[in-house]
Amino acid sequence: MFNGIIVIDKAAGMTSGDVVYKLRRLLKQKKIGHAGTLDPEVTGVLPIALGQATKLIELMHERPKAYVGEGMLGLATDSYDLEGKILAERALSQPVSDQAIKAAMEKLIGEIVQQPPIYSAVRVNGKRLYEYAREGIPVERPKRTVQVFLYDLTAPSQFDPEKGRQTFTYEVECSKGTYVRSLVNDLGEELGLPAVMTKLRRTASSGYKLQDAVTLEELADNLDHAEDYIQPIDSFFADYQQVDLDAALWQQVKNGAWIKLPLDADKVALRYNKTVKAIYRAKGQGLYCPDLMLLSNE
């Protein structure tokens, strides 16, 4: 059984569940889970936990994410992307300046309150929003507070005078739970124009980047060397404070005991034989207790 994290560069047209299903067949193991759903038409970084690494999925969700994408001014849909029903169209008589677009983006940086698109996997009363939408049932979408660390243009925008549409490319860095589709819609509201997301690619998630990723096709063609594409569990904890345990402390940790450490970090990675065996969290006065046990990690 494989243990670790494989970062898949997801192709368009697949759900995150499709990727897990294909990996189970390719790698011939069941214990596999993904960290961070990507919509079918969104491409890019999808971290997949294998074996023992499935214990990390909740922690993986907590890490910031990064995207590059494209949006368009002059059109709005109910899904905030091109998959939805058109709600508004307005031909622009002249382009919006890039300065104005960037200024509107800056207003959406920081802690903001977002409403997810109606076509999203957010649950309300045990049912996903897209299920309500497909059945035509009105439902109040829950608001959530998210963090946007970066929202900026990556190139000059392009104006099509014949269609009265303006396209722009952008980059986003954000916390978990942020909908980039909503950010594009919110940008349009700031500018007083309909806006829709036309493309999106995730470039980083859970601490892993595109350069760490492999496509399913590449993996299938090189199955004899599958291990070459798998990141060790320890790679996820590279930015944690590391503590090497002696034999006595290791015995305590194996038994789930609280231990005393001369540290002030909130969480620490405890290593034995150069391998992370547990994550402990601070309880005050130098005491640390178990947060995540990885005793079988080799």
UniProtKB/Swiss-Prot annotation:
InterPro entries the UniProt entry points to: PsdUridine_synth_cat_dom_sf, PsdUridine_synth_N, tRNA_psdUridine_synth_TruB, TruB_C
KW Isomerase (keyword) present: yes
Recorded catalytic activity of this chain's protein: uridine(55) in tRNA = pseudouridine(55) in tRNA
Pfam short name (any one): TruB_N
Keyword Isomerase: yes
CDD domains in the cross-refs: PseudoU_synth_EcTruB
Its EC number(s): 5.4.99.25
Catalytic residues in the record: D39 (nucleophile)
Gene Ontology molecular function: RNA binding; tRNA pseudouridine(55) synthase activity
One Gene Ontology term from the biological process aspect of the record: tRNA pseudouridine synthesis
Keywords: Isomerase, tRNA processing
Function comment: Responsible for synthesis of pseudouridine from uracil-55 in the psi GC loop of transfer RNAs.
Family: Belongs to the pseudouridine synthase TruB family. Type 1 subfamily.
Record's protein name: tRNA pseudouridine synthase B
